[in-house]
Amino acid sequence: MHVLFPGSFDPPTLGHLALLRRAAALFDRVTVGIFINPDKSYLFTPEERREMIRLATADLPSVFVDVDSGYVADYCKRNEIPLLIRGIRGDGDLPFEKMAEEYNRERGIETLFFFSAPTLADVSSTEVRRRIREGEELSSIVPAEILPILRQKQKDLRAE
């Protein structure tokens, strides 16, 4: 079965990678959909995010990466993907995820939720971006494969 893991991945975290590893073990094909919201600003370009996910999942041959600016349900219909996978870190994620699940289900797309390991419950792209801006340690919350890219971003931001 082909599944979609949608998100902004700005940048990818160890939580994202843990979910991808679990999904890759269960499904034939996992597409990471980097969705662009024109109303949001991002620290990394779509191309940078695609490359980071590619690097972090190089050992997972069933994981593919795509970039789109439309609706997740429309992407699923176009690509004949019947199932979304989403991560739940804690109770704070539930209201949005419940609303999104209902919206997608009404459009014929089911959602499977994966709960984060307790050690990853506080890991978020928001926290990674904060640490990048503050010049703080990153290795405990991001895949090692993308550390050089993130450290370069830290240097670039300090130089501004």
What name fits each language-model region?
Residues 1-160:
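Nucleotidyltransferase catalytic core that binds NTPs
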